[in-house]
């Protein structure tokens, strides 16, 4: 006997829930931080994103120190959820945690960790429409 997957709020509300998350990828972003040293290896770090908190953030990650900033992978992370970011090469993942306005991007915990220092957080954006009071 199979079990049907449960969706938040049932059928009709699920469509709205799904649309909200689809819209996050296309929403307007507010630049909160740029890594001034994005051409150097990056271990673990905490970034103060200012006084305006967001429920959702977009974190852009470079795959290598030598990559031009236009070649980044954008990751959406949500406050209160277990999140990680990646640059889509070598399957290197970094855990993201929140503490007030501080966002900590940790050292990689999976993938080809022999080259982890090359997966570099580049920019953090707040996603408009998810502002917290």
Task: Give names to the regions the model predicted.
Residues 1-26, 32, 125-133:
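Enriched but not universal
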Residues 2-5, 66, 105, 118:
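Compositionally biased, intrinsically disordered/low-complexity regions enriched for serine, proline
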Residues 7-10, 71, 110, 123:
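Intrinsically disordered, low-complexity segments enriched in proline/serine/threonine
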Residues 10, 18, 23-24, 51, ...:
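Intrinsic-disorder/low-complexity loop/linker signature
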Residues 12-18, 61, 73-74, 81, ...:
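Generic cytosolic/nucleocytoplasmic N-terminal low-complexity/intrinsically disordered segments
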Residues 17, 32, 47, 57-59, ...:
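Hydrophobic beta-strand residues in large extracellular and virion-surface proteins
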Residues 23-83:
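Beta-rich globular "head" domains
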Residues 86-133:
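Extracellular jelly-roll beta-sandwich "head" domains, especially the C-terminal globular C1q domain
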């Amino acid at each position: 006997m199979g079990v049907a997957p449960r969706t938040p709020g049932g059928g009709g509300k699920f469509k709205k829930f799904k649309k909200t998350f689809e819209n996050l990828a296309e929403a307007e972003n507010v630049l909160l931080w740029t890594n001034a040293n994005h051409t150097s290896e990056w271990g673990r770090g905490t970034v103060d994103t200012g006084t305006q908190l967001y429920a959702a953030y977009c974190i852009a990650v470079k795959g290598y120190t030598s990559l031009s900033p236009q070649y980044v992978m954008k990751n959406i992370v949500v406050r209160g959820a277990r999140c990680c970011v990646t640059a889509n090469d070598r399957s290197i993942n970094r855990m993201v945690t929140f503490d007030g306005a501080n966002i900590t991007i940790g050292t990689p915990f999976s993938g080809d960790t022999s080259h982890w220092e090359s997966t570099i957080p580049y920019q953090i954006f707040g996603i408009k429409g998810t502002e917290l009071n």
